[in-house]
């Protein structure tokens, strides 16, 4: 299942659709060391998405959004995803991220998780694919269980 598909512009900007999803089944397992639970799920994307635009930046992570009440710091999963990406890559880096929210917040549709996944995929493309899909999945697991 593709959660995001990015379009790269001039090697410095990635534009992604971050699709909502619904769980068709959800089995909750044991608690992980990070406090989240292991889950097994069958999910399906739906035709509702947030637009995520990621621009390469040398040093800072800056998030802007069309919703004033969304966090723009490390409490935002997209911000945390960016931090994890550069930590794993072992280089200083940053990004300017704009999130146009269409997915309802806290509705169980994985809007925030999808935004984090979109940022990881976008950065991976912008930095010439340093991580495999499996490695990106491991980075994403550090951010949550969705």
Q: Each predicted region: which residue ranges?
A:
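Residues within alpha-helical segments
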Residues: 79-83, 120, 141
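Acidic active-site catalytic centers that drive phospho-/nucleotidyl reactions
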Residues: 21, 115, 146
């Amino acid at each position: 299942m593709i959660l995001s598909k990015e379009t790269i512009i001039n090697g410095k900007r990635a534009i992604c659709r971050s699709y909502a999803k619904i769980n068709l089944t959800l089995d909750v397992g044991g608690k992980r060391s990070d406090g989240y639970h292991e889950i097994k799920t069958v999910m399906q994307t739906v035709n509702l998405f947030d637009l995520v635009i990621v621009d390469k930046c040398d040093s800072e992570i800056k998030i802007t959004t069309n919703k004033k009440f969304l966090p723009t710091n490390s409490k935002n999963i997209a911000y945390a995803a960016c931090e994890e990406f550069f930590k794993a890559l072992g280089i200083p880096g940053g990004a300017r991220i704009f999130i146009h929210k269409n997915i309802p917040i806290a509705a169980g549709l994985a809007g925030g998780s999808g935004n984090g996944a979109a940022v990881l995929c976008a950065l991976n493309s912008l930095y010439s694919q340093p991580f495999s899909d499996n490695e990106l999945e491991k980075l994403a697991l550090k951010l949550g269980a969705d």
